[in-house]
């Protein structure tokens, strides 16, 4: 991606310090390449790629874009723009051997290499019509299906037919699930539409439920062994310690947030900003 030197210099001066406990600093600012606007691509979710790249997913236009130093600008999907297309892509993730795309309507996982070349695909049986997914650092994928109100485990290109977590067993877990995430230890976090966060072990054992105390939480973000919630206005809070964070205004409006180690990547309308998080 191209970077604006003047923007970067000014953004490095922006620091958010809250309660002398956590520090957010803007480490990088990456404006979208011009091809994004030329092709009228509007990514609404994204994921860290490899070698400093990012994967941008436009769920409306069914388009996946890779931007960064590894491949420059590359795209796959869309309506008639490429040899291969998606029906309803709802999630993109990076595995040790490539990129995974979860297609809800087709009930399948599509595998691409890091240059977005098609490799293979796996059909999901039973037909989950998946809504959300998350992947851990070992390549285990966890898929939420509202049809079953359950989380399924997908490993080594095989879907376990028995739910990893049957949410129907928990009366305190709402049927409306907003986010599903996995942390560095493989533990699962669920953000419900009612602002409650539910935590499970990597084996699917229930740990605890915690009420979020920020208005309209939209994003659930694991950073190391801590869990945070953020809303679209950039207000954030660690759900256990209740320490607040504020995303700098330059990163607003927020369309998606993803973490890697101690860094946050913020997807906005025309750029990605990267924040370093210092935990004291």
What are these regions (language model features)?
Residues 35-39, 78-84, 122-126, 165-173, ...:
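Surface loop/turn motifs at the tips and blade-to-blade linkers of beta-strand repeat domains
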Residues 51-52, 96-97, 138-139, 185-187, ...:
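Short coil/turn segments that connect the beta-strands within blades of beta-propeller domains
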Residues 35-62:
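Beta-strand-rich domains and repeat architectures in extracellular enzymes and scaffolds
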Residues 252-280:
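Blade-level signature of beta-propeller repeat domains, shared across WD40, Kelch, NHL, RCC1
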Residues 21-42:
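A short helix->beta-strand "capping" segment at the edge of beta-propeller domains
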Residues 49, 56-60, 101-106, 143-149, ...:
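Conserved beta-strand positions in repeat-built beta-propeller and related beta-rich domains
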């Amino acid at each position: 991606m191209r970077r604006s030197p003047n923007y970067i210099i000014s953004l490095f001066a922006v620091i958010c310090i809250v309660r002398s406990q956590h520090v957010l600093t803007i480490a990088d600012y990456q404006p979208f390449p011009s091809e994004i606007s030329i092709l009228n691509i509007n990514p609404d979710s994204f994921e860290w790629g490899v070698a400093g790249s990012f994967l941008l997913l436009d769920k409306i236009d069914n388009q996946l874009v890779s931007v960064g130093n590894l491949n420059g600008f590359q795209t796959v999907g869309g309506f008639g723009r490429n040899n291969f297309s998606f029906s309803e892509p709802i999630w993109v993730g990076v595995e040790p051997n490539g990129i995974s795309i979860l297609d809800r309507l087709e009930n399948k996982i599509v595998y691409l290499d890091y240059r977005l070349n098609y490799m293979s695909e796996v059909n999901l049986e039973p037909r989950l019509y998946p809504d959300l997914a998350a992947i851990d650092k070992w390549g285990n994928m966890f898929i939420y299906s509202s049809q079953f109100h359950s989380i399924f485990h997908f490993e080594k290109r095989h879907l376990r037919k028995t739910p990893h977590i049957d949410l129907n067993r928990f009366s305190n877990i709402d049927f409306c699930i907003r986010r599903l995430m996995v942390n560095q230890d493989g533990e699962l976090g669920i953000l419900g539409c009612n602002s409650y966060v539910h935590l499970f072990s990597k084996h699917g054992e229930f740990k605890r439920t915690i009420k979020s105390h920020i208005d309209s939480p939209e994003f659930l973000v694991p950073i190391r062994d801590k869990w945070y919630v953020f809303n679209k206005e950039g207000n954030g809070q660690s759900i256990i310690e209740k320490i607040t964070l504020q995303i700098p205004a330059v990163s607003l409006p927020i369309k998606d947030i993803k973490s890697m180690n101690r860094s946050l990547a913020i997807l906005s309308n025309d750029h990605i900003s990267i924040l370093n998080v210092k935990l004291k």
